[in-house]
Amino acid sequence: MSASIDLSSYRDQHFKGSRSEQERSLRDSSTLYVGNLSFYTTEEQIHELFSRCGDVRIIVMGLDKYKKTPCGFCFVEYYTRAEAEAAMRFVNGTRLDDRLIRVDWDAGFVEGRQYGRGKTGGQVRDEYRTDYDAGRGGYGKLLSQKIAPNTDNR
């Protein structure tokens, strides 16, 4: 494998199975995790970009688990491993909606994984962010709650 398609060190802590089963699933998978998306990026934009590398079987958009709105990630599944490898090689680190996107191997989509795992419903990384990122909802969610103006007029 070339460096661009090697497995990263990230492992899904909610994976049902042993570490070696997860490694095997990642090495055989044709599913990719796509991160650092704008909350405004559409499924159509993702399909247009990723279909340049092969036939996309399905795209599952990541959603805020409470609001059911996009929260900056998705899963892209191809029909073959070779197509997914091409996407890892050519799409990882490219720009989509003025954002550098991250592409990583995924062991395969399981129902429920489309929802953010953060306390506020979105992604954990967006809860603690201290910078302002308009494409990902402004300031981090937990920071925004702490600095929200007093609206009860006291």
Curated annotation (Swiss-Prot):
Task: Give residues annotated as binding mRNA.
Answer: Y10, Y33, R102, V103, D104, W105, D106, R113, Q114, Y115, G116, R117, Q123, V124
Q: Name one Pfam family in it.
A: RRM_1
- The name on file for this protein is Nuclear cap-binding protein subunit 2
Location of the protein in the cell: Nucleus
GO-annotated molecular function: RNA cap binding
Organism for this UniProt entry: Drosophila mojavensis
Q: Which UniProt keywords apply?
A: mRNA processing, mRNA splicing, Nucleus, RNA-binding, RNA-mediated gene silencing
Instruction: Write down the InterPro entries for this protein, in alphabetical order.
Output: NCBP2 (IPR027157), NCBP2_RRM (IPR034148), Nucleotide-bd_a/b_plait_sf (IPR012677), RBD_domain_sf (IPR035979), RRM_dom (IPR000504)
> What processes does the entry annotate via GO biological process terms?
mRNA cis splicing, via spliceosome; negative regulation of viral genome replication; primary miRNA processing; regulatory ncRNA-mediated post-transcriptional gene silencing; siRNA processing
Q: Which family does it belong to?
A: Belongs to the RRM NCBP2 family.
Q: Does the keyword Kinase apply?
A: no
Record domain RRM: where: 30-108
Please state the gene responsible for encoding this protein.
Cbp20
Looking up SMART domains in the UniProt record yields: RRM (SM00360)
| Complex and partners | Component of the nuclear cap-binding complex (CBC), a heterodimer composed of Cbp80 and Cbp20 that interacts with m7GpppG-capped RNA. Interacts with Ars2.
Q: What is one cellular component GO term in this UniProt entry?
A: presynaptic cytosol
Chief subcellular location equals nucleus
Function, in words: Component of the cap-binding complex (CBC), which binds co-transcriptionally to the 5' cap of pre-mRNAs and is involved in various processes such as pre-mRNA splicing and RNA-mediated gene silencing (RNAi). The CBC complex is involved in miRNA-mediated RNA interference via its interaction with Ars2 and is required for primary microRNAs (miRNAs) processing. Also involved in innate immunity via the short interfering RNAs (siRNAs) processing machinery by restricting the viral RNA production.
